[in-house]
């Protein structure tokens, strides 16, 4: 038991086979750095304009080789605002020659900045699946979490993506992500998606494919908020009480390997923030070219309760 009087996550899981990965994961997720044009209150990577841990060209090249050798199918790109990495456009074009599916997680408003306004067309041309963060469907709530002026810019970018065919054409997928604006669990995803679709279409004529409801994980900037407001213990107990073993088979960490900005390997992006590298001797993407990790035991922590609470945190398949 921890000081919170909550079992360690590993001990909580009775069916330990679900804490093992697939032998040949299909998804490679990469975090290209925490550089971002906004500073969100819930951000688990502490993203912001002053962050300097950008992934370098050499690491991108190692990722491409490892992706090919490992016969991965999906490349999942996150940050920060991944578009701000100077190698981003080049990498998208290169990896599109090898990946069946490319996912980019965007904050939307970076695509309204003049230096990045060409990227939506690149997404369209490469059939990139866009997973866009939109914490709510009205300005007041979004402003509290992401800052004043973010919501109208997000709406403008969504309109532009719709104009390019996103959310409308079969091969141009636009998914949105909801984060709770506080120390509570997200509502049921299906009902929330219906509300999002109605509100965004009725008010702005915006359409999208799916909504993913993410539970805020108690790490990074959100953890700082919880401790500052003396909410950490209560929130962890809330996650623990909502633990649902039925979520375990579908956890993305079971079918994924995650690469940090410096090329280090993790079971998920949350473990990257917690500095919990994968088990075994292979711990850098450059080693994947000549080594196969095989079935791995997933390295767990208390934050894993965030992905297994309630119906599970789909996260656009983040968890």
Each language-model region and where it sits:
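Short cysteine clusters
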Residues: 36, 40-43, 253, 268, ...
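Residue-level recognition of short loop/turn positions
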Residues: 39, 106, 261-263
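Core AdoMet radical
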Residues: 27, 47-56, 70-85, 95-115, ...
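Alpha-helical structural signal in soluble globular domains
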Residues: 66, 90-98, 122-126, 157-160, ...
């Amino acid at each position: 038991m921890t000081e919170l009087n909550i079992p360690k996550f590993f001990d909580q899981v009775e069916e330990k086979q679900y804490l093992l990965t697939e032998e040949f994961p299909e998804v490679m997720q990469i975090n290209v750095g925490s550089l971002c044009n906004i500073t969100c209150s819930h951000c688990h990577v502490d993203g912001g304009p002053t962050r300097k841990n950008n992934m370098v060209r050499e690491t991108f090249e190692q990722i491409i080789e490892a992706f090919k050798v490992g016969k991965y199918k999906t490349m999942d790109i996150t940050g920060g605002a991944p578009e701000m990495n100077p190698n981003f456009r080049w990498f998208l074009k290169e990896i599109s020659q090898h990946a069946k599916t490319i996912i980019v997680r965007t904050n939307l408003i970076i695509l309204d900045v003049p230096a990045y306004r060409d990227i939506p067309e690149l997404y369209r041309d490469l059939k990139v699946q866009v997973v866009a963060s939109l914490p709510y469907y009205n300005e007041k709530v979004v402003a509290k979490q992401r800052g004043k002026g973010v919501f109208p810019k997000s709406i403008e970018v969504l309109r532009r993506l719709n104009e390019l065919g996103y959310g409308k054409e079969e091969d141009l997928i636009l998914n949105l992500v909801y984060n709770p604006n506080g120390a509570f669990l997200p509502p049921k995803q299906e009902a929330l998606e219906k509300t999002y679709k109605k509100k965004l279409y009725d008010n702005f004529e915006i359409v999208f494919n799916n909504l993913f409801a993410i539970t805020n994980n108690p790490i990074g900037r959100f953890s700082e908020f919880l401790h500052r407001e003396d909410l950490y213990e209560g929130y962890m107990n809330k996650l623990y009480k909502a633990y649902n073993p039925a979520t375990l088979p579908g956890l993305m960490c079971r079918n994924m390997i995650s690469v940090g900005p410096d090329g280090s390997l993790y079971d998920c992006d949350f473990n990257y923030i917690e500095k919990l590298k994968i088990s075994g001797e292979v711990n850098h993407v450059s080693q994947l070219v000549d080594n196969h990790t095989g079935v791995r035991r997933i390295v767990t922590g208390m934050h894993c309760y965030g992905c297994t609470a309630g119906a599970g945190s789909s996260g656009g398949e983040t968890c």
